[in-house]
Amino acid sequence: MSEPEKTDSVETVKNTIKSTQLTTEHAKKLTQVVNSIPTILSKLDNSEYDEIFGHRINVDSKKFVDVAVRNEILLKFLAADEYDVELATKRLIDTLNWRNKFHPLSAAFDENFNKALNDLGAITNFVGLKSDNLNVVTWNFYGATTPKKLFEEYGDNAGTTTNQRPGSQFLRWRIGLMEKSLQLVDFTDPKNNKIAQVHDYNNVSMFKVDKGMRAATKEIIKIFGDNYPELLSTKFFINVPSLMSWVFTFFKTIGVISEATLKKFQVLNSGNLTEWFGKSNLPPTYGGDSKSSMKELNVASIKLSPYGEYILEELGKKEIEDVIDEVE
């Protein structure tokens, strides 16, 4: 009979957190979540799936568990629900179940997507910026293709991968972009434990947005809101027509967008981002003087965490076994 896993003290848990100064009350709440990990895992659809953002969410003694990183990730879930342990626990269970079903690491590191999709985005990793949590950025170039054509080919579950992963190719590509970017953050570093997003609407009509694009955007917003808490530092909306800029303020007035969320938004009529990222980091398209294009600035090779690699290896083995079972 195995011995019960020892519980962590409030002081021990508090000392692992480097991203912020935890109050004693918040540290107590986080300790509750940490010590309830076995219970959380027991309530999952698959109790063996314990990965979030490529890191193992399990008890201290398990292989691959980085206690400090694990606790920082758990803290994000807790903070997103205003330190309500019950709500945070439910969010964790839902996220682990979603990851077990969706396999976002596969979308990021195993699956191949059409060039039309890959041209829609990029990931940059700048250094030496004056503001925190702007180092890692995901870029979305909505004008890179025709939305109608894009969603006819890659939306609404069209052209899903051969092993029938959940979601459309567009959704899996976009989630994969997010997952890749998270491998570049340091969850223990208050200056680099979040990412920024740039949404470039150059050449996109804000009045004739394709219905497929609207539906996909709505789905992605929900998935990110549910499963990627406290990971966004700033969201830039650039090349937005002047006539549309008032919409964000209007949403705030009627309560659709909260004050906290609105503070993360930067809505620009132009594409000049030098105030935040500096001229030397950006190509002329975004106000800079770098001779590198966005394609060249894109971080093409991103290494997955050791536990993430292990998860993908196990997933591959399971799929091979499933194929063998079908043949037999």
Curated annotation (Swiss-Prot):
Its cofactor is heme b. Residues 129-294 form the CRAL-TRIO domain. CDD domains: SEC14 (cd00170). It is found in: Cytoplasm; Endoplasmic reticulum membrane; Microsome membrane. Heme binds at residues 142, 174, 199, 201, 235. Transmembrane segments: none annotated. InterPro entries: CRAL-TRIO_dom (IPR001251), CRAL-TRIO_dom_sf (IPR036865), CRAL/TRIO_N_dom_sf (IPR036273), Sfh5 (IPR042938). Keywords: Cytoplasm, Endoplasmic reticulum, Heme, Iron, Lipid transport, Membrane, Metal-binding, Microsome, Transport. Pfam families: CRAL_TRIO. It comes from the Eukaryota. One of its GO terms (cellular component) is plasma membrane. It is a peripheral membrane protein. One of its GO terms (biological process) is regulation of exocytosis. GO terms for molecular function: heme binding; metal ion binding; phosphatidylinositol transfer activity. PROSITE patterns: CRAL_TRIO. SMART domains: SEC14. It catalyses: a 1,2-diacyl-sn-glycero-3-phospho-(1D-myo-inositol)(in) = a 1,2-diacyl-sn-glycero-3-phospho-(1D-myo-inositol)(out). Belongs to the SFH5 family. Non-classical phosphatidylinositol (PtdIns) transfer protein (PITP), which exhibits PtdIns-binding/transfer activity in the absence of detectable PtdCho-binding/transfer activity. Regulates PtdIns(4,5)P2 homeostasis at the plasma membrane. Heme-binding protein that may play a role in organic oxidant-induced stress responses. PANTHER family: PHOSPHATIDYLINOSITOL TRANSFER PROTEIN SFH5. This is Phosphatidylinositol transfer protein SFH5. It comes from Scheffersomyces stipitis (strain ATCC 58785 / CBS 6054 / NBRC 10063 / NRRL Y-11545) (Yeast). The gene is SFH5.
